[in-house]
């Protein structure tokens, strides 16, 4: 039976597609062995074992961004990580390494290459990260979420691998049950606010300032503030605050409108289910979130606003009227669904299994 090593993690944006592909591979080949490579600090340390997969860990190795002491220490630490992963590959008889970006992916790509094991890469964002740019150079196959992502001639659009709970979600059928389970009223317009697995301080700060004025219109708010954020619940009626949700499918099903960052994972989940959204791209980094959101905004399924412009006045002028306009929300829902995809996990699993099948035989490990 096949032994798969899936590498990636850190945030939900890396962990969720990894788990989606793992679930798809397990469903297709129940006797296979699926190992996950990550770090002890990442979200994978909790979610991977909870999903029933074995987690192997290496030290967290951020790529150095400037020539300093950390850069000097990086090279030997990276070399040690590659060696550690090569031993894992040999000892566990790994047949293919599948990388999703993040701290664990880059050394896994090199370890696989040096061990003669095929590499398959999935890139979630429109603008690829450093690890996956490296991985694409040695990969047998590359799956991308957005058309136009620059990862070489082997790149193929597969969409975002989504967890089965999202990919099979019938929003209309489960909305009332989802609201009941979350403690929400069944018939009120519902705004979901989420900044991703680590939260979004500026979104949190703005929404809490206008929560009472939003709920005064008769709406209700489910606000996922993120486990890493310091936040005080103001105690406003119909303003429901939680730190982190392991059941995002319930939160999504309950929502009429979402305010969210524009990470590829969140965006792909919302468009797959056809949820209208206000996207506030993360203003730091390489700008990939602003690129991610272009397609859904052009289709009419979302609104984009810069982080600096996402103020209480902006929310009152744009979010509140939209939340109370069912016809506009219905049009946005249809447009969002037109750019979403639900079968990314299946498409990605096809690439992985093709890579395994095309491998002629297990070569000797190069020392």
Curated annotation (Swiss-Prot):
> EC number(s) on record?
2.4.1.227
Does the UniProt entry include the keyword Membrane?
yes
| Catalyses which reaction(s) | di-trans,octa-cis-undecaprenyl diphospho-N-acetyl-alpha-D-muramoyl-L-alanyl-D-glutamyl-meso-2,6-diaminopimeloyl-D-alanyl-D-alanine + UDP-N-acetyl-alpha-D-glucosamine = di-trans,octa-cis-undecaprenyl diphospho-[N-acetyl-alpha-D-glucosaminyl-(1->4)]-N-acetyl-alpha-D-muramoyl-L-alanyl-D-glutamyl-meso-2,6-diaminopimeloyl-D-alanyl-D-alanine + UDP + H(+)
Listed A to Z, the keywords are:
Cell cycle, Cell division, Cell membrane, Cell shape, Cell wall biogenesis/degradation, Glycosyltransferase, Membrane, Peptidoglycan synthesis, Transferase
InterPro entries with a match to the protein in the record: GlcNAc_MurG, Glyco_trans_28_C, GlycoTrans_28_N
Task: State its role.
Answer: Cell wall formation. Catalyzes the transfer of a GlcNAc subunit on undecaprenyl-pyrophosphoryl-MurNAc-pentapeptide (lipid intermediate I) to form undecaprenyl-pyrophosphoryl-MurNAc-(pentapeptide)GlcNAc (lipid intermediate II).
Provide the primary localization. membrane
Q: List, alphabetically, the SUPFAM superfamilies matched.
A: UDP-Glycosyltransferase/glycogen phosphorylase
Q: Where does this protein act, in terms of pathway?
A: Cell wall biogenesis; peptidoglycan biosynthesis
Q: Belongs to which family?
A: Belongs to the glycosyltransferase 28 family. MurG subfamily.
Which BP terms does GO give this entry? carbohydrate metabolic process; cell division; cell wall organization; lipid glycosylation; peptidoglycan biosynthetic process; regulation of cell shape
Q: Which Gene Ontology CC terms are recorded?
A: plasma membrane
GO MF annotation terms: UDP-N-acetyl-D-glucosamine:N-acetylmuramoyl-L-alanyl-D-glutamyl-meso-2,6-diaminopimelyl-D-alanyl-D-alanine-diphosphoundecaprenol 4-beta-N-acetylglucosaminlytransferase activity; undecaprenyldiphospho-muramoylpentapeptide beta-N-acetylglucosaminyltransferase activity
Q: Which residues bind UDP-N-acetyl-alpha-D-glucosamine?
A: 11-13, 125, 163, 197, 289
Protein name from the UniProt record: UDP-N-acetylglucosamine--N-acetylmuramyl-(pentapeptide) pyrophosphoryl-undecaprenol N-acetylglucosamine transferase
Subcellular location, record wording: Cell membrane
| Membrane topology note | Peripheral membrane protein
By its UniProt entry, which PANTHER family does this protein fall under? GLYCOSYLTRANSFERASE, UDP-N-ACETYLGLUCOSAMINE--N-ACETYLMURAMYL-(PENTAPEPTIDE) PYROPHOSPHORYL-UNDECAPRENOL N-ACETYLGLUCOSAMINE TRANSFERASE 1
Biological source species: Clavibacter sepedonicus
Read off the Pfam families from this record. Glyco_tran_28_C (PF04101), Glyco_transf_28 (PF03033)
């Amino acid at each position: 039976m096949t032994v798969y090593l899936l590498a990636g993690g850190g945030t939900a944006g890396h962990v969720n597609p990894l788990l989606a592909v793992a679930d798809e591979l397990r469903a297709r080949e129940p006797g296979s062995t699926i190992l996950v490579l990550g770090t002890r600090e990442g979200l994978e340390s909790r979610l991977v074992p909870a999903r029933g997969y074995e987690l192997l860990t290496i030290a967290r190795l951020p790529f150095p961004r400037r020539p300093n002491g950390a850069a000097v220490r990086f090279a030997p630490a990276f070399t040690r990580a590659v060696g550690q992963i090569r031993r894992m590959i040999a000892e566990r008889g790994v047949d293919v390494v599948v990388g999703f970006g993040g701290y664990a992916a880059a050394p896994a790509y090199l370890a696989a290459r040096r061990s003669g094991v095929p590499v398959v890469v999935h890139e979630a964002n429109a603008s690829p990260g450093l690890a996956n740019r490296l991985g694409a150079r040695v990969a047998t196959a590359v799956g991308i979420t957005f058309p136009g992502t620059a990862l070489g001639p082997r790149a193929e659009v597969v969409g975002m691998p989504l967890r089965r709970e999202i990919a099979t979600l019938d929003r209309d059928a489960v909305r009332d049950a989802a609201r009941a389970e979350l403690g929400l009223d069944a018939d009120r317009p519902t705004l979901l606010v989420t900044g991703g697995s680590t939260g979004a301080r500026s979104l949190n700060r703005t929404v809490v300032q206008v929560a009472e004025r939003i709920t005064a219109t008769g709406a209700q708010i489910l606000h996922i503030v993120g486990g890493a954020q310091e936040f005080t619940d103001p105690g406003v009626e119909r303003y429901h605050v939680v730190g982190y949700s392991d059941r995002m499918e319930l939160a999504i099903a309950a929502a009429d409108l979402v305010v969210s960052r524009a990470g590829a994972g969140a965006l792909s989940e919302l468009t797959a289910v056809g949820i209208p959204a206000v996207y506030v791209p993360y203003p730091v980094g390489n700008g990939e979130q602003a690129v991610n959101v272009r397609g859904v905004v052009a289709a009419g399924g979302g609104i984009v606003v810069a982080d600096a412009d996402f103020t209480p006045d902006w929310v009152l002028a744009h979010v509140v009227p939209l939340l109370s306009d069912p016809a506009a929300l219905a049009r946005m829902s249809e447009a969002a669904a037109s750019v979403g995809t639900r079968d990314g996990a299946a498409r990605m699993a096809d690439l992985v299994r093709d890579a395994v099948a095309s491998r002629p035989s297990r070569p000797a490990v190069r020392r």
